[in-house]
Amino acid sequence: MKHIPRKRFGQNFLTDDTVLYNIIRAIDPQPQDTMVEIGPGLAAMTRLLLEGVQQMHVVELDRDLVERLKKSFDPKRLIIHSADALQFDFSTIPVPAGSKLRVVGNLPYNISSPLLFHLAEMAPHVQDQHFMLQKEVVERMVAEPGSKVYGRLSVMLQWRYHMELMFVVPPTAFDPPPRVESAIVRMIPLAQPLPCDQAKLEQVVLKAFSQRRKVIRNCLAGMFAESDLLEVGIDPQLRPETIPLAQYVALANRL
């Protein structure tokens, strides 16, 4: 029976074989990898990944799709977690000593940002991540200071990862086609992020970008004096989108 994509799960299934093979080439699965796919859907990518790995895990919320997966794959090779990826504890996936998780997925666009922040908590235990996301989101993730789209997502994720937009995917590659272009992003956790308390950095960045049109002195009024900004090399008249990650970290370390 044909599965009808569900809007509430943000389901857009990747059906273009050329795009699928390009994604697999970018991931380059190896037999001993501990691979976990978020939202396998109709398993188009799952099947190709299983050609390269001995065993993999999938996290799927849609119970109908979970049943399809159970009927289609050997349970010794495909371990299915019927769960919401936003709530799932990825540390429960067993990984051989000396290895790390490889995480992949065509992420539901309606939960992409909170899911990326949830996964960031697992960064020390992850080798890499390859995700299909809305192109606009990927552009925000990799944006540099001075860009119109540089913001909270850019700073918080660049503190944790080296990221690269691999290639753009047109709406026609999906069923049903989304209204926007998509892109593949590669995320490699940094071995040594700049020393900083994550909660404090989040606090600073959230306040800084809550009023983008104001200068940083006004955005952070009540949290930092102008002298604090000057001491970490920030011109108080700059706008928040022009300030690099290292200076946000320096501010967080003053809290």
Swiss-Prot record:
Keywords: Cytoplasm, Methyltransferase, RNA-binding, rRNA processing, S-adenosyl-L-methionine, Transferase. GO terms for molecular function: 16S rRNA (adenine(1518)-N(6)/adenine(1519)-N(6))-dimethyltransferase activity; RNA binding. S-adenosyl-L-methionine binds at residues 12, 14, 39, 60, 84, 106. Pfam families: RrnaAD (PF00398). It is found in: Cytoplasm. Its EC number is 2.1.1.182. NCBIfam families: ksgA (TIGR00755). This is Ribosomal RNA small subunit methyltransferase A. It comes from Janthinobacterium sp. (strain Marseille) (Minibacterium massiliensis). The lineage of its organism: Bacteria, Pseudomonadati, Pseudomonadota, Betaproteobacteria, Burkholderiales.
